[in-house]
Amino acid sequence: MEEALKENIMGALEQVVDPELGVDIVNLGLVYDVDMDEDGLTHITMTLTSMGCPLAPIIVDEVKKALADLPEVKDTEVHIVWNPPWTRDKMSRYAKIALGIQ
């Protein structure tokens, strides 16, 4: 996948905000990998802040909606993984500031 396309996808994913934390999933460090096959099927590998997150279906739907606006994306599969586990260390500086974490 071209780097420019990957950047566009990550930019679209920055519009997906974790409803509990109010920060986007990219800056939270929840997106682990982005890939697209030759047919435009996009694979998003991501995690959530906790295994019991009741908002997982909402976040997955928001990811699909955000990517539907990109002409290269024909469909999206979201793969939720728990390994490696998410930690605050994965958050961007922006996310840490927004959440008051040092």
UniProtKB/Swiss-Prot annotation:
Short name of any one Pfam family annotated for the protein: FeS_assembly_P
Superkingdom assignment: Bacteria
Family (UniProt): Belongs to the MIP18 family.
PANTHER family (UniProt xref): FE-S PROTEIN MATURATION AUXILIARY FACTOR YITW (PTHR42831:SF1)
Function: Involved in the maturation of iron-sulfur (Fe-S) proteins. May function as a Fe-S cluster carrier.
Protein name as catalogued: Fe-S protein maturation auxiliary factor YitW
Species annotation: Bacillus subtilis (strain 168)
Lineage, opening ranks: Bacteria, Bacillati, Bacillota, Bacilli, Bacillales
